[in-house]
A protein has these predicted regions:
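Terminal catalytic/cofactor-binding subdomain
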Residues: 1-118
């Protein structure tokens, strides 16, 4: 059995039935100012990651989206879970629109990258 098939078999052996299987994702991004410096994590006299987190959570209060501030200062979006990948794609598009509109207003940029803190 190929490595791909063994991995697939292992993953699916721990999964639930097709009728109840759902999919979700987590997306992390770092936020930078116009000088390519990361924005502060804590509240201060400039727009911070903490300010962004509060605004994102307010904007998503009527959904199952979850936002958090990660140890490296990046913002993480955890999607709701969906049965259809198209619904997940729609949720991702809404998340991107929400965060991008805030960043544009504040003159900030994002870098989407997953990191390992160790």
């Amino acid at each position: 059995m190929s490595v791909k098939n063994r991995l697939k078999s292992y993953i699916l052996s721990k999964s639930i039935g097709d009728k109840t299987r759902k999919i979700g994702i987590e997306v992390e991004c770092f936020i930078f100012d116009k000088n390519k410096k990361r924005i502060p994590v804590n509240k201060c006299d400039t727009f911070s990651a903490s300010d962004l987190l509060v605004e994102l959570n307010l904007n998503s209060k009527n959904s199952n989206d979850q936002y958090s501030l990660e140890p490296g200062g990046q913002i993480e979006w955890a999607s709701p879970v969906f049965e259809k990948i198209q619904d997940l794609d729609n949720a991702l598009s809404k998340h991107k629109h929400s965060i991008d509109s805030i960043l544009k207003r504040e003159g900030l940029q994002s870098l989407y990258i997953g990191v390992d803190p160790f």
